[in-house]
Amino acid sequence: MAITRLGRKDFEKLLEFRVTLRRFQRWSEDQARMAGLTHVQHQLLVAIKGHRGDVPPTVGDLAGYLLLRPHSAVELVDRAQDAGLVERTPDGEDGRVTRVRLTAEGDRIMQELTQSHLERLHELAAVLDELVNSSGGTAPDR
């Protein structure tokens, strides 16, 4: 792959992209706080609710999603369980495995937060599309 000399517009786009992401992250953290969650608890609930498959995730699954060490994920799940947001349940097929699922309260909070996040992401999609597809930069198309 040949290296292309990047122009000023490329760096301006990159900066705008990073600022846009950071603003979304800050907004998301504020939304979580207003819902009574820490931003890390919100990420945990997203990981549980967004887990693919027919069974809830394990703590190991959650550690992978959140890029945490397993013992850190255990502590996070402990705190969320103490807050009434999640519950642990034994796996139906392997008694050594514990799964984590949302409580009714955790699910209610996730429904509210996800609705506002999806609305915000639709707004950001147009901004990001413009950044990626606008002319003036020198970076090659993919």
What residue spans do the PLM features occupy?
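Short, charged, intrinsically disordered terminal tails
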Residues: 54, 132-142
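Amphipathic, non-transmembrane alpha-helical scaffold segments
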Residues: 18-21, 66, 110, 114
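Charged, amphipathic alpha-helical coiled-coil/dimerization segments
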Residues: 78-136
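Short, hydrophobic-biased segments on the C-terminal half of alpha helices
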Residues: 59, 77-78
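N-terminal helix-turn-helix DNA-binding core of bacterial DNA-binding proteins
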Residues: 26-69
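Pre-recognition alpha-helix immediately N-terminal to the DNA-recognition helix
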Residues: 16, 43-47, 108
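N-terminal leader segment of winged-helix/HTH proteins
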Residues: 1-35, 83-85, 138-142
